[in-house]
């Protein structure tokens, strides 16, 4: 391990407790790739501007590439008493190449260096999560297409409401994930600006060219204001919020999968490789994956609130409080990536029990609204009158132990003689489902349109 780089101002050795509190290497070593990438770009710019020699730049570049290779092979371990990943790599570089390594930090502060490394990490993982969202959407669309005619009770208040198809239900989650994808990509563009060159807070007197490093690192342009840049963690808050929203959507789907796989429903069966057993009850098959996804949502929400709380009262510019920005982001990113991977695999492998879903449609009088709509459209009744008549019909069905769709015409007319024979066919659950032909509705033909629209959208994303 390289010799620790000391502060020029502090004359006494740091307290061991201060070191334990202050040192971030145990967690920010995750940023080694970004730190090396940023340093190579910075050294290139310094050379282009004549601030350091080409010879020194080439030594720095080769040394950094060697360090990267040694980290990834395990030859160079990021451990020891270095304060952070930045000091660890700079110190090791200087040990390897001598004085040229000491020139690397010219016209740079750890403030803009940290901002750069962290932003590069967030940008890279924003793209990774966005790609996983697309993969999940593709799987949702596949399941939806296979089940555009599979009826199940649509619910409000977790009570049977109206008949829908399972494809339509899965398209609701595909729509959520589409918004999530667009949110991540919007954040990527908004945050794709280079912090390097801002130095501590006010820029630098060296004749640097921030556009050079920006271009080298793939950013759109340098950031506008250095004071803002070194203290900005909006990009970290955005990825935390975006992940929290994705996890919330996953948690809602997970809750439904947990319910649907229970004996009281049996609407879906999770594959054995995506379920666990019990240590004492041999008959059990537990939905641990959706339960864990639901539980992990609380953790990522906590990471968002934690960083919001850290940032809420900080004066400009950088403050050491901001070292608390990274662990929550690293944790949320890891959690989101693993969660999206396992969710997609689980959904692709689950079995949809179509008969159980359709049997459930005979409970709860799902076509009651169709009777009220019939009385309004065909008999000209005010909706509130039709609503009360339909309520009386439902009460009659309850008394007879039948679903409203099973009542005879005679039963219906005993409540109101204006109910004619043509209503009987409308009360069939499948007819009720397919009657909802408005744009975005649950009719099979509309569901298939939504599927085709989303397929076209997916193709456009693949072309980008």
UniProtKB/Swiss-Prot annotation:
Task: Identify which top EC class this enzyme belongs to.
Answer: lyase
Single annotated GO MF: argininosuccinate lyase activity
Species of provenance: Sulfurovum sp. (strain NBC37-1)
Recorded hits in SUPFAM superfamilies, A to Z, give: L-aspartase-like
A Gene Ontology BP annotation from the UniProt entry: L-arginine biosynthetic process
Name the UniProt record assigns to this protein: Argininosuccinate lyase
Q: Which domain of life is it from?
A: Bacteria
First and last residue of the signal peptide: none
The record's principal subcellular location, in a coarse class, is: cytoplasm
Per the similarity annotation, which family is this? Answer: Belongs to the lyase 1 family. Argininosuccinate lyase subfamily.
Q: Where in the cell is it found?
A: Cytoplasm
Q: Which gene carries the instructions for this protein?
A: argH
